[in-house]
Amino acid sequence: MPDKRALSDSYEQLPLKRAATVSSNTNDISDERIIATLRHPRACVSASGSPFSASPSFQQPVPLCSFSFDEHRKQWHDDRCKRFYRGPPPYNQRHPRQHGARAVFGADLNYGLERFVRRDQDVPEHLDALVAALQHRTEAAVSDEERDQVDQERRKADVVTWRGIITKICTAYEQTAEARFSDPLELNAMMLDDTLYLEEYTCKSARAQKQNKEDDPKMLRMGYYGYSFESYCTVDTELQTREPFRPIPSKESSLPHPAGWSGDVNTNVQWCQVVKTKLGNNRLVIGGEVDAVERNPKTGREELVELKTSMQMTWAQHNPSKAALDQERFEKKLLKFFLQSYLLGIGKIVVGFRDHHGILTTHQDFETLRIPRMVRAGQPIAGRFDHTGKPVIRQQSVWEPKDGLGFGDQILSFIRQTILSRSIQATPTEQISAGAGANTPNPTAAVGQVHHPVYRVTFRSPFDQVEMRCLSEQEIYEEVQDSGGSGARVGFLPRSFYDFVQRRAGS
């Protein structure tokens, strides 16, 4: 049976044309602690060429388990926070700022902003929820035989991480020093039982900068629009998807909530899916948030739906140059949309387009597997026509999925091979010490503390190579283990999960 995850106009699964250069030579590197580098594959080809002849093989994601976070950020190993896609309310509203306009507008995405509850970003979460879900999946089995069978998926995995990290790794190919908004990559990496675990690392100054940006009233409002769109488009039960849109009574006010509003936004609440898949030579177990599900009327199966918002695009008839700029910006944004959904097995993306005032003007459904064709050379450019009225044909691809997936596969293999080559799988020593003085919070002195190597993976401007270095024990304690403030850990993994893995390895 053909792989259902094959891209539209699928690429042949051929070997990579050439591999990116891996080097352990540090002569040209200022930080002597760097132990290995991976050159960006662009260095091997001309500016207009691609280093990859085909996309690496990618297996259709298979669900393993799911879990929920409630409004207090408590994790539950069930689907209580799963949402069902209904779609946005009708476009029959008058615009609050354009009094002479016809009643053809949709939902006001500003609604409920004053009651917006944001998750506390200062609380480090690491991979805790993901590995807890994997541990629970095994321990919930009713027999030893079933536990062994269930745990095989975790033990066979080459990489365990969040979907967002794999997305970031795969979009690394497109990063350039000249880009208006760069997105550097910085990860913590460790091996346990032959499996690579990856988490994102953000230094204190970068966290503060990010928080200040998100606290800016304008940025806060723009970030809120996406969550508001989700509230308008989703409901708690499948039965509610068949109910008509109408104003909802409010407990807090005499005025009802607008039609379609399903509840105030609280970003603590999430429903997450954990899947197994394979990218090139790397077997992955990844977890990520899913916005909603939708019943397929033909198959009867629930299918995953991703919800996004974007600024509406200028009509070409009104301003051709601005329309072309808007189109180009949106097509570049589609790369991240595509990867986020493709990696988790989400087949449908719904994008709500809004105006500058946060009013929904239209929405569009995108089939995930067909997105690469939209930006490929030789295809018509949406909304663009020449003087004869014929569609303008794209001369050059905006992006190619084979490049991002290919470089992503290389980065994962590079990290794994680098750590394995340093014999990191030697059993960590348990330090049984008398304890340190009160004024010396040294992790090496903790009774029963397991010391496990952790590596820092970086890819930053000028984005010409990925670098790896081994963290010191002090860095692990302060930067990875939050100076002991996030509970007992081995590396960045919870000690309870580490002990679980050790028990399973000995079973």
UniProtKB/Swiss-Prot annotation:
Q: Which organism is it from?
A: Mycosarcoma maydis (Corn smut fungus)
On the tree of life, the source organism's domain of life is: Eukaryota
Q: What class of enzyme is it?
A: hydrolase
Q: Could you say which EC number(s) this protein's record lists? A: 3.6.1.-
**Official protein name in the record:** Decapping nuclease RAI1
Indicate where this protein resides in the cell: Nucleus
Q: Which residues bind substrate?
A: R73, C272, E289, K308, Q340
Q: What cofactor does its activity depend on?
A: a divalent metal cation
Which GO molecular-function terms appear in the entry? metal ion binding; mRNA 5'-diphosphatase activity; nuclease activity; nucleotide binding; RNA binding; RNA NAD+-cap (NAD+-forming) hydrolase activity
- Top-level taxonomy: Eukaryota, Fungi, Dikarya, Basidiomycota, Ustilaginomycotina
According to its UniProt entry, the protein's GO biological process terms are: mRNA processing; NAD-cap decapping; nuclear-transcribed mRNA catabolic process
Q: What job does this protein perform?
A: Decapping enzyme for NAD-capped RNAs: specifically hydrolyzes the nicotinamide adenine dinucleotide (NAD) cap from a subset of RNAs by removing the entire NAD moiety from the 5'-end of an NAD-capped RNA. The NAD-cap is present at the 5'-end of some RNAs and snoRNAs. In contrast to the canonical 5'-end N7 methylguanosine (m7G) cap, the NAD cap promotes mRNA decay. Also acts as a non-canonical decapping enzyme that removes the entire cap structure of m7G capped or incompletely capped RNAs.
Q: Which InterPro entries match?
A: RAI1, RAI1-like_fam
Q: Where does a divalent metal cation bind?
A: E230, D291, E306, L307
What is the gene called?
RAI1
- Reactions performed catalytically: a 5'-end NAD(+)-phospho-ribonucleoside in mRNA + H2O = a 5'-end phospho-ribonucleoside in mRNA + NAD(+) + H(+); a 5'-end (N(7)-methyl 5'-triphosphoguanosine)-ribonucleoside-ribonucleotide in mRNA + H2O = a (N(7)-methyl 5'-triphosphoguanosine)-nucleoside + a 5'-end phospho-ribonucleoside in mRNA + H(+); a 5'-end triphospho-ribonucleoside in mRNA + H2O = a 5'-end phospho-ribonucleoside in mRNA + diphosphate + H(+)
KW Coiled coil (keyword) present: no
For this chain, the family text in UniProt reads: Belongs to the DXO/Dom3Z family.
Write down how the cofactor binds this protein.
Answer: Divalent metal cation.
Give the record's keywords alphabetically.
Answer: Hydrolase, Metal-binding, mRNA processing, Nuclease, Nucleotide-binding, Nucleus, RNA-binding
